[in-house]
Each structure stands twice: as structure tokens, then as C-alpha cells.
Amino acid sequence: MFVNSVLAESNSLYIGDLVFYIVTFIILMLLVKHFAWKPVTDMMKKRADKIANDIDNAARSRESAEKMAAKRQAELQSSRQEAAEIVSNAKKSGETQRAQIVETAQKDAQALKQQAQKDAEQARRDALNSAKDDVANLSIEIASKLIQKELKADDQKELIDSYIEGLVEHES
């Protein structure tokens, strides 16, 4: 009996302690929930929101950077194309100007050549006309002198030589 009474007392002691521990644990949980759990969950939620915002901002920044890089690449390609067109147009313009200059130079050279030919022809005509006039004048002078006097063969030769010398001096 003694053993039974000790066991009964010890069971009630354990049950009382157990109830005390359970009540204390529940009170402790309520205090933790009220003072620690809510602020910790709020802090974790704020941190999760901040991380999500940072990820979204990073994604937007990356997309913006990709768009800007694509835009710069397109502008660079456009600039290269414009530069190639400018160079091509400059080459075409240079070739056109070169062809015009060559054509003008050829026309000018042809005109100068024709003018030189005309001048040479005119000079030849003038020389022929002058020679004809000189020969005619000389013939008239010779004929008039022959008529005025009859010459011997030596006198005739001397007269002709003097007129030829005069003609040569006259042309010089």
C-alpha cells in the first residue's frame, strides 16, 4: 500500500507539473507570437518584397540596356551604310567630273588644233599670194628692163641673179 500511495502521489505530481508546463508553454507561445513572430514575419515579408522589387528592377534595367544596345547597333549600322553611300556618291561625282574635264580638254585641244590648222593654212595662202605678187612684180620689172635694153647672155644672168638676191632679201 505504501507503494500505491507513493505512486498515486507521484502521478498527481507529474500531472500537475505537466499542466503547469503546458500552460507556461502556451503563454510563452502567445507572447512570442505577439512580440516576436509578427515583427519577424513582417520583416521577412518586407525583405521578400524588396528582393522581388530588386529582381524586377534588374530585369527592367537589363531589358532597357539590351534595347539601348540594339538601338546603338542599328544606329552604328545605319551610320556605316550612310558613310558607304557618301563615299560611293563622292566616287561617282569624281568620275563624272573627271569625264567632264577630259571631254572639255579634248574639245579645247581639238579647237586649238583646228585653229592652228586654219592659221597655218592662212599663213600658207598669204605666203603664196605674196610670192605670186613678188613673182608678178619681178616678171614685170624684168620684162620692162628687157624691153628697155637688149642684154647679152652674161648681162641677163647677172640681172636675174640680182633680182633673185633682192627677192631673198625682201622675204627675209
From Swiss-Prot:
TM region positions: 12-32
Biased amino acid composition, Basic and acidic residues: 63-74, 116-131
SUPFAM superfamilies: F1F0 ATP synthase subunit B, membrane domain
Principal location class: membrane
Annotated region (Disordered), positions in chain: 63-131
Signal peptide as annotated in the record: none
Keyword terms of this UniProt record: ATP synthesis, Cell membrane, CF(0), Hydrogen ion transport, Ion transport, Membrane, Transmembrane, Transmembrane helix, Transport
Membrane topology: Single-pass membrane protein
Subcellular location, record wording: Cell membrane
PANTHER family: ATP SYNTHASE SUBUNIT B, ATP SYNTHASE SUBUNIT B', CHLOROPLASTIC
Family of this protein: Belongs to the ATPase B chain family.
Biological role: F(1)F(0) ATP synthase produces ATP from ADP in the presence of a proton or sodium gradient. F-type ATPases consist of two structural domains, F(1) containing the extramembraneous catalytic core and F(0) containing the membrane proton channel, linked together by a central stalk and a peripheral stalk. During catalysis, ATP synthesis in the catalytic domain of F(1) is coupled via a rotary mechanism of the central stalk subunits to proton translocation. Component of the F(0) channel, it forms part of the peripheral stalk, linking F(1) to F(0).
Protein name: ATP synthase subunit b
Organism: Limosilactobacillus reuteri (strain DSM 20016)
